[in-house]
Swiss-Prot record:
Pfam family, one: FMN_bind
Protein name per its UniProtKB record: Na(+)-translocating NADH-quinone reductase subunit C
Keyword Membrane attributed: yes
Catalytic activity: a ubiquinone + n Na(+)(in) + NADH + H(+) = a ubiquinol + n Na(+)(out) + NAD(+)
Species for this entry: Chlamydia muridarum (strain MoPn / Nigg)
Gene: nqrC
Cofactor names: FMN
Length: 318
C-alpha cells in the first residue's frame, strides 16, 4: 500500500519539481548569505586597500604596526586615540586595527584631484561625489581629465583640521603623496599604489593590492622584501650629469632583468631601476609599463611638488 502511495517518487515530473525546489531554496540561502556578508566584505576590502596604501607610504610597517619618521629613520609608533595623532612608542606597538586605521585616514589623508596643468583641487570644488568617482577601480587613470591623488598630511594638530579644499589651495602641509598605479601583468590587470616623498620624485614605497599573477613567480610583486627595493628610487630619470629636467626626462621606474648594481652600476639610471624577479620577466615588464603609463598624467603635478619643495616657500597651488 505504501509503495503505491509513493509511486510518484519515480515520476519525471516529481524529480524535476524536487530539483527545482531544492535549487530555489539553495539559491535563496546563498543570496541571503551574500547580502548579509556584502557590507563586511566591502569593509574588509577597503581596510586592505587603505592598509596597503599606508604601507607604501611607510605609515604602517609590513608587520601591520604604525610607525613615524623621527631622528632620521622610521620608528615604532602608536596611534593615540584620544589625541588622534601618532606618537613615538618606546615599546612594541599594537597591531593596526580597523578603528585606528579609519581614524588616521580621516584625520591625515586627503583625497584630492589634479588636472593636466598640475593644479590641485578637491572633490567639493568640482561638485563631485568621492565614492562615485572611485567606484570604478578597473578604469584607467587616463580615462578622466581629473586624476586622483592621496595626500598624507603632517602628523600635527593643525594639519588634521584642514579641509581638502584648504590643502589643495596651499599644499605645504602635505608630507607625502600616493598615486594609484594600474597595468597588466602576465595573466591580467594589476592594481597598486606608489608613494612619493613631498619632493614628487623620491619613492617611499610601493604595493600591489590586486593581481592574478603566478604564485611563487609573478605574485612576488607583493613580497615586502622585493617591494623594499623601490625605497629611495627616483621616478624622474636624471641625466648623466646628475641634473633632472622634470619637463622632458623619462618618468617611471624600470624593473630590469638581472641586477641593477651589476648592469647599471652607479649610473643615474640605476636610481630609477630595481632588480627583476627571477622567472617573472613578463610580469616585471608589466610593472614597468604600469609605472610609465600611470605616472604620465601626473608629470605636471610632480614637477609642481619638486619646485615647491626646492623653494621651501608657502604659496597657493592655483
Amino acid at each position: 500500500m505504501a509503495s503505491k502511495s509513493r509511486h510518484y517518487l519515480n515520476q519525471p515530473w516529481y524529480i524535476i519539481l524536487f530539483i527545482f525546489v531544492l535549487s530555489l531554496v539553495a539559491g535563496t540561502l546563498l543570496s541571503s548569505v551574500s547580502y548579509v556578508l556584502s557590507p563586511i566584505q566591502k569593509q574588509a576590502a577597503e581596510f586592505d586597500r587603505n592598509q596597503q596604501m599606508l604601507m607604501a607610504a611607510q605609515i604602517i610597517s609590513y608587520d601591520n604596526k604604525f610607525q613615524i619618521y623621527a631622528e632620521g629613520d622610521w620608528q615604532p609608533a602608536v596611534y593615540n586615540t584620544k589625541k588622534q595623532i601618532l606618537e613615538k612608542s618606546s615599546s612594541t606597538p599594537p597591531q593596526v586595527t580597523v578603528a585606528t586605521l579609519c581614524s588616521y585616514f580621516q584625520n591625515f589623508v586627503r583625497v584630492l584631484l589634479t588636472d593636466s596643468q598640475g593644479n590641485l583641487s578637491s572633490f567639493e570644488d568640482h561638485n563631485l561625489n568621492l565614492e562615485e568617482f572611485l567606484s570604478h577601480p578597473t578604469s584607467s587613470v587616463q580615462d578622466h581629465s581629473l586624476h586622483v591623488i592621496y595626500a598624507i598630511l603632517a602628523n600635527d594638530e593643525s594639519s588634521k583640521k584642514l579641509s581638502s579644499s584648504q590643502v589643495a589651495k596651499n599644499p605645504v602641509s602635505i608630507e607625502s603623496i600616493i598615486l594609484p598605479i594600474k597595468g597588466f601583468g602576465l595573466w591580467g590587470p594589476i592594481y597598486g599604489f606608489l608613494a612619493l616623498e613631498k619632493d614628487g620624485n623620491t619613492v617611499l614605497g610601493t604595493c600591489w593590492y590586486q593581481h592574478g599573477e603566478t604564485p611563487g613567480l609573478g605574485a612576488n610583486i607583493t613580497n615586502p622584501q622585493w617591494q623594499q627595493n623601490f625605497r629611495g628610487k627616483k621616478v624622474f630619470l636624471a641625466s648623466s650629469s646628475g641634473e633632472t629636467d622634470f619637463a622632458k626626462t623619462t618618468l617611471g621606474l624600470e624593473v630590469i632583468k638581472g641586477s641593477v648594481s651589476a648592469l647599471l652600476g652607479d649610473s643615474p639610471k640605476a636610481n630609477s631601476a630595481v632588480d627583476g624577479i627571477s622567472g617573472a620577466t613578463l610580469t616585471c615588464n608589466g610593472v614597468t609599463e604600469a609605472f610609465a603609463n600611470s605616472l604620465a598624467p601626473y608629470r605636471p603635478l610632480l614637477t609642481f611638488f619638486a619646485n615647491l619643495n626646492s623653494s621651501g616657500e608657502s604659496h597657493d597651488n592655483q
